[in-house]
Each structure stands twice: as structure tokens, then as C-alpha cells.
């Protein structure tokens, strides 16, 4: 099984679409890499694979090896800066054209998920993050059954569940938490995404979708609340254009001044180069927020 070299497997789940699972997966991967861990991301959102675009590698094509695939490298490990390697696998790399629709029935989706879990040749990984579609569909059932049957119990660390603050979102995400209970998947915690909006001019954070719904839900299910993540337009600029985030002078997040933290390894290179994403993300206002979330997950998984 291709998961034999993986230490910890973390699922990123949500019962609601559009809550930012792929964004959370991307930032968890970057934060883990910044902490020196080797990371893989497996995108099993078969009908809407967005992970390739998040990392700026949507034009990449996987290499076919005897019996499987070699994942795409986002960046290699850099011992001089303490950065860990990051690799990605997605159905998006296998489509003939980027805009092609995937119109598959349940059995074919199930077979594809199982193939992804068995036929991708990962190097030694500290963490494999699995980005999933919304809901509790065939992909989720196949994923849970395969992991529970074939992965070692110590490998399957658990799930990070993503929601937004509104009741219309948490109502569906509660079903995902029930799914985890029924399938025996441990919940590592709940992330409340899109909890506030960071003004690009003054960096003040305003609640536009309410706030606190994710924390209330976590308490109701007696699971850890990992934190709130606001919407930051500068993160979108980074993902879409490759330009480093920039903020007004004196902008501080969690006591860290990020207004001058724009140095990247490329010495100011503002091209959309996936190899530089992990360095540029350090200057994003969301990085100091994801840092403690990532640390909590690591502490929970490795205790």
C-alpha cells in the first residue's frame, strides 16, 4: 500500500460546500512545511479538484510509474531555512483539459478513491492531508472504509472539520461530525473559516457572516475548537497572482508585525512560482493564525 511511508493521515472534512476546505488544507500544508515537516496533499474532490490551482500547479502532469503515479512536487525541503518538502496528487492532473467535467457514477468514484490511496508513490511523509468534497457521499464512505481497513490505527490521526459561522452552514457540518462518530474517525477539531473580513486598507477585521457558530458547534459535540480564520483578500492575491501579501504600516496579528514581513527567498520575485509560495505565505496575515492551529494539531497527533 502506498501509505506505508506516511506517519500521520489527516482528513479535512465539511458537510457544507463553499466553506473553504481547500483553502484550509492549503494553509495547513504550508504551515506544516514551514514547521519543517514533509507534507503530502491528496485531493479526493473528484468533481471539483481545486488543490492544483491553490498551489499554482494546475498545468502540471503526473508521471506514470510501474503500478502507480508519482505526485507533483510543489517544493523540495530546504534545510537552510527549515522548510519541509510538499507534494500533491489530484485528479486535476489526470484530466486531458483543465475545464473537463468529471461525470462518474458512485462505483467509479469509489474505485478512483481506492486507487489514489493505493497507487500514489509518496516519499517519506510526516503528514498526508486529504482534501475531500462536501457532504457524506460515496467518496467519504470509500475513504473511511479503505483507511480504517488498510491504514495502521496510529497512521489515521483524525479529521479537521471546517465550517463558516452561519447557522445554515453549521446545520450541515453537524451531520459531518455525526458521520465521523458513526465511522469511528476521531475529530481533531473544528475550524471556523470566513470568520470576519480583513480590510485591505486599514487591516481591521469586521464580522460579515456573524461569528461564533463553529465554536458553539464544537462545544455541543465536545470536540476541540481550533480557531477562527478571517477572509483576507491578500491571501487571494497570493494564490491567484503569486504576489506577496502587503499590509499598511504597523499591521499586527497575534502580536506579530506583518507589515514589513515581505522578504522571500527569491529576493523580491513576484512571479507565480509554486516553489516560492511557502516563503511568501509567511508574510500573510493568516500565517500567524494558522501557526497555533497547526501546533495544536501536531501536539494532539504526536502525544
UniProtKB/Swiss-Prot annotation:
User: How many cofactors are bound and how?
Assistant: Binds 4 [4Fe-4S] clusters per heterotetramer. Contains two stable clusters in the N-termini of NBP35 and two labile, bridging clusters between subunits of the NBP35-CFD1 heterotetramer.
Cofactor annotation: [4Fe-4S] cluster
Q: Where does [4Fe-4S] cluster bind?
A: 199, 202
Location(s) in or outside the cell: Cytoplasm
Recorded GO molecular functions are: 4 iron, 4 sulfur cluster binding; ATP binding; ATP hydrolysis activity; ATP-dependent FeS chaperone activity; metal ion binding
Q: Which InterPro entries match?
A: Mrp-like_CS (IPR000808), Mrp/NBP35_ATP-bd (IPR019591), NUBP2/Cfd1_eukaryotes (IPR028600), P-loop_NTPase (IPR027417), YlxH/NBP35 (IPR033756)
Self-association state and partner proteins as the record states: Heterotetramer of 2 NBP35 and 2 CFD1 chains.
Protein name, please? Cytosolic Fe-S cluster assembly factor CFD1
Give the organism the record lists. Chaetomium globosum (strain ATCC 6205 / CBS 148.51 / DSM 1962 / NBRC 6347 / NRRL 1970)
Amino acid at each position: 500500500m502506498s501509505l506505508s511511508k506516511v506517519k500521520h493521515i489527516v482528513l479535512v472534512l465539511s458537510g457544507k460546500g463553499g466553506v473553504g476546505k481547500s483553502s484550509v488544507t492549503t494553509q495547513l500544508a504550508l504551515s506544516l512545511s514551514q514547521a519543517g515537516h514533509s507534507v503530502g496533499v491528496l485531493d479526493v474532490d473528484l468533481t471539483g479538484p481545486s488543490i492544483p490551482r491553490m498551489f499554482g500547479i494546475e498545468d502540471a502532469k503526473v508521471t506514470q510509474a510501474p503500478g502507480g503515479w508519482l505526485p507533483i512536487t510543489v517544493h523540495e525541503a530546504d534545510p537552510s531555512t527549515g522548510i519541509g518538502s510538499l507534494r500533491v496528487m489530484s485528479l486535476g492532473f489526470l484530466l486531458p483539459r483543465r475545464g473537463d467535467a468529471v461525470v462518474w457514477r458512485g462505483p467509479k468514484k469509489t474505485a478512483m478513491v481506492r486507487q489514489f490511496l493505493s497507487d500514489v508513490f509518496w516519499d517519506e511523509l510526516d503528514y498526508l492531508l486529504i482534501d475531500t468534497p462536501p457532504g457524506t457521499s460515496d467518496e467519504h464512505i470509500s475513504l473511511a472504509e479503505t483507511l480504517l481497513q488498510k491504514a495502521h490505527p496510529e497512521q489515521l490521526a483524525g479529521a479537521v472539520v471546517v465550517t463558516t459561522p452561519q447557522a445554515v452552514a453549521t446545520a450541515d457540518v453537524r451531520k459531518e461530525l455525526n458521520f465521523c462518530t458513526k465511522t469511528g474517525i476521531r475529530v481533531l477539531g473544528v475550524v471556523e473559516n470566513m470568520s470576519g473580513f480583513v480590510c485591505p486598507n486599514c487591516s481591521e477585521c469586521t464580522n460579515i457572516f456573524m461569528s461564533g457558530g463553529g465554536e458553539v458547534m464544537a462545544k455541543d459535540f465536545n470536540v476541540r475548537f481550533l480557531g477562527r480564520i478571517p477572509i483576507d483578500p491578500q491571501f487571494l492575491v497570493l494564490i491567484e497572482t503569486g504576489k506577496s501579501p502587503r499590509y499598511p504600516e504597523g499591521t499586527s496579528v497575534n502580536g506579530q508585525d506583518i507589515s514589513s514581513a515581505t522578504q522571500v527567498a527569491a529576493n523580491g520575485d513576484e512571479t507565480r512560482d509554486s516553489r516560492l509560495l511557502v516563503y511568501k505565505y509567511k508574510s500573510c496575515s493568516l500565517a500567524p493564525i494558522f501557526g497555533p492551529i497547526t501546533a495544536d494539531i501536531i501536539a494532539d497527533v504526536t502525544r
